[in-house]
Amino acid sequence: MTGLEPFGARLRRAMDERGPLCVGIDPHSSLLAEWGLDDSVSGLETFSRTVVEAVAGRVAVLKPQSAFFERFGSRGVAVLEKTVQEARAAGALVVMDAKRGDIGSTMAAYAESFLHRDAPLFSDALTVSPYLGYGSLSPAVALARESGTGLFVLALTSNPEGGEVQHAVRADGRTIGATMLGHLALENAGEEPLGSFGAVVGATLGDLSSYDLDVNGPILAPGIGAQGATAADLPAVFGSAVRNVVPNVSRGVLRHGPDVVALRDAAERFAEEIRTAVTAA
């Protein structure tokens, strides 16, 4: 399989050219209703097409949440396929937010579903869960290297329940979250200008100075907007790693739909706020 240019290099270029903003595509039923759309495959398709039209190619990343498509069965997955393909054709990098995690051949099959160049759902990167052991991700790591794609590994997530696992302390004195960050630093060692194996770290977590976030890879940071974090918080939370942060905004942008211009304006406002905060750090 002939791979793309590595995901980390493509992402760094997109961040430099368009700013680091990631816009989530989260068509949950209440948001479809706010847009005046039916909670149906038709509503799902209209919603997704509108978001892609509004912001693809204007922000660094689009991140569809696969569960909101999967709930409609095969017809919803068909809409997801179309959404991914149209977003990439319009110039966006697509991170599939599927949070897959398993072992052996099953993990390999999950990786092939999203990271193999011939897959209908082929995306630029995939979110994965390492909590069957980081080594369980090795099939996905190998395929990502081969295909020029990337992974975002759940490390320090923004949901309160995550701390039960991620802040647990191992026998060697390190937390589970810190261990995951250490694995990513090894994956990305020596990569320029940016490694392809990133961490998911919540922007709402406050002071993370006890963690080494410099993994030489991207940090996908949910929590900006509706969850309470702001662009101005990013330097304090992420410190010297802030230049590698890809802040995710979903509802803060999507609530401005269904008007394409309003969606685009909201995304551009967030992008400018983030760019200003990162530049000033």
Residue ranges and their predicted role:
Residues 15-16, 52-58, 84-89, 141-147, ...:
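Acidic (Asp/Glu)-rich catalytic clusters
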Residues 71-86, 103-109, 132-145, 204-212, ...:
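Active-site-adjacent beta->alpha loops and helix N-cap segments on the catalytic face
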Residues 199, 203-248, 252-253:
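A C-terminal functional module that forms or caps the active site or interfaces directly
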Residues 234-244, 253-281:
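C-terminal helical cap(s) of enzyme catalytic domains, especially alpha/beta-barrels
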